[in-house]
Structures are given as structure tokens and as C-alpha cells.
């Protein structure tokens, strides 16, 4: 069953209908946890196609992000999977061919177990908090770094939480 989860995720992501007015992106990320484990993430995002506080310095925008992460490492919680969904706010600084940006978001994530790496999350359903920074190029591609924290916000004990620190690459589709 657990080996079928990545295939089910890819099938679900490929069957999502994206409105023609919204831009979609695919991302890949490789990261490490604070406990020496590795993470591998595939994501699909949809631009909100809205801007706020647009000035000569930059603008605030955002996107919806859906992701699948494979968690490797740890004695008791190796080989776990998670699905996540989050709204992400992005402040994009002004620029011609390269636009630096910072991002932050809070969403939800469902894990294939309560132990991930050497951490006990206490619950399979957790919150996802993220911050990141990167560069967006004129062709729509982006590269950056991201820190994501997962925990159940104290709704169930134990609540060790776990982090993923990653490098990502995003391309428009």
C-alpha cells in the first residue's frame, strides 16, 4: 500500500483541472531534516493571479501549493510519505530579468505515520509552516531555499515536530 502512495499522488496531481487564467508550476526540492534525514518533494502550484501593495519596490502576491514529500532516514520513522496543501504569500521585489522574493505560508499535511525520522509527531495530521527566499527569472522559472516546520500545534501529545530545509527548483507548465 505504501509503495502505491507515490503513484496515487502523481495520478491525482496530473488529473487536477487548472483554469486557463491561472498559471501552474511544477517544483522539485531536495532537503535535509534537523535529524540528519533527507526529504524529496514534488509540488504543484497555482498562481493567485492577484497583486496587492504594488509599488516600485515590489508587490505582494501568492499561490496555492500541493505537495508530496518522501521522508528518508531515522531509526523508527524511515520511509514515510506526506501530502500537503498550503496557501503561500510571496513578496516579489521589482526587477527586470531576475526578481528576488520571500515567501511564507501555513497549511496542512497528512503523514503516512506518526513517526517521521526520529521524531514522534503524535498525529498523522499536522500543520505546515514555511518560510523561503529565492529568485524568479523572466522565463518563469524559480530557484530558492525553504524551511518547512510540521507539528500538530499541541493538539495531541507527543508533539516533537520536524523540519525540512531544502533547495527547490520550479518551472511553469
From Swiss-Prot:
Pfam families: PagL (PF09411). The gene is pagL. One of its GO terms (molecular function) is acyloxyacyl hydrolase activity. It comes from Pseudomonas aeruginosa (strain ATCC 15692 / DSM 22644 / CIP 104116 / JCM 14847 / LMG 12228 / 1C / PRS 101 / PAO1). It catalyses: a 3-(acyloxy)acyl derivative of bacterial toxin + H2O = a 3-hydroxyacyl derivative of bacterial toxin + a fatty acid + H(+). Residues 50-56, 90, 99-100, 129-138 are extracellular. Decreased activity at low temperatures (15 or 21 degrees Celsius). Homodimer. GO terms for biological process: lipid A metabolic process; lipopolysaccharide metabolic process. Residues 25-28, 33, 72-73, 94-95, 116-117, 149-173 are periplasmic. Residues 1-23 form the signal peptide. The chain crosses the membrane at residues 29-32, 34-49, 57-71, 74-89, 91-93, 96-98, 101-115, 118-128, 139-148. The record marks 152 as: Critical for activity. Disruption phenotype: Has similar growth characteristics to wild-type in LB medium at different temperatures (25, 30 or 37 degrees Celsius) or in LB medium supplemented with 0-4 M sodium chloride, 0-1,500 ug/ml chloramphenicol, 0-5% ethanol or 0-1% chloroform. Only when chloramphenicol is present in the medium is a difference in the ability to grow observed. The difference is most pronounced at a concentration of 650 ug/ml chloramphenicol, where the absorbance of the wild-type culture after overnight growth is 1.7-fold higher than that of the pagL disruption mutant. Belongs to the PagL family. It is a multi-pass membrane protein. The active site is at residues 149, 151, 163. Keywords: Cell outer membrane, Hydrolase, Membrane, Pharmaceutical, Signal, Transmembrane, Transmembrane beta strand. It is found in: Cell outer membrane. GO terms for cellular component: cell outer membrane; membrane. Its EC number is 3.1.1.77. SUPFAM superfamilies: OMPA-like. This is Lipid A deacylase PagL. The lineage of its organism: Bacteria, Pseudomonadati, Pseudomonadota, Gammaproteobacteria, Pseudomonadales.
Amino acid at each position: 500500500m505504501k509503495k502505491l502512495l507515490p503513484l496515487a499522488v502523481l495520478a491525482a496531481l496530473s488529473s487536477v483541472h487548472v483554469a486557463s487564467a491561472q498559471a501552474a508550476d511544477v517544483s522539485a526540492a531536495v532537503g535535509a531534516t534537523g535529524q540528519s534525514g533527507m526529504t524529496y518533494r514534488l509540488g504543484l502550484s497555482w498562481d493567485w493571479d492577484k497583486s496587492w501593495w504594488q509599488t516600485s519596490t515590489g508587490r505582494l502576491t501568492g499561490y496555492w501549493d500541493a505537495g508530496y514529500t518522501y521522508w528518508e532516514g531515522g531509526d523508527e520513522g524511515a520511509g514515510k510519505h506526506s501530502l500537503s496543501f498550503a496557501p503561500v504569500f510571496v513578496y516579489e521585489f521589482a526587477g527586470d530579468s531576475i526578481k528576488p522574493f520571500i515567501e511564507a505560508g501555513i497549511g496542512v499535511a497528512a503523514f503516512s505515520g506518526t513517526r517521521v525520522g526520529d521524531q514522534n509527531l503524535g498525529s498523522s495530521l499536522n500543520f505546515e509552516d514555511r518560510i523561503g527566499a529565492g529568485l524568479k527569472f523572466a522565463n518563469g522559472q524559480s530557484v530558492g531555499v525553504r524551511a518547512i516546520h510540521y507539528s500538530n500545534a499541541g493538539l495531541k501529545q507527543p508533539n516533537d515536530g520536524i523540519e525540512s530545509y531544502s533547495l527547490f527548483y520550479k518551472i511553469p507548465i
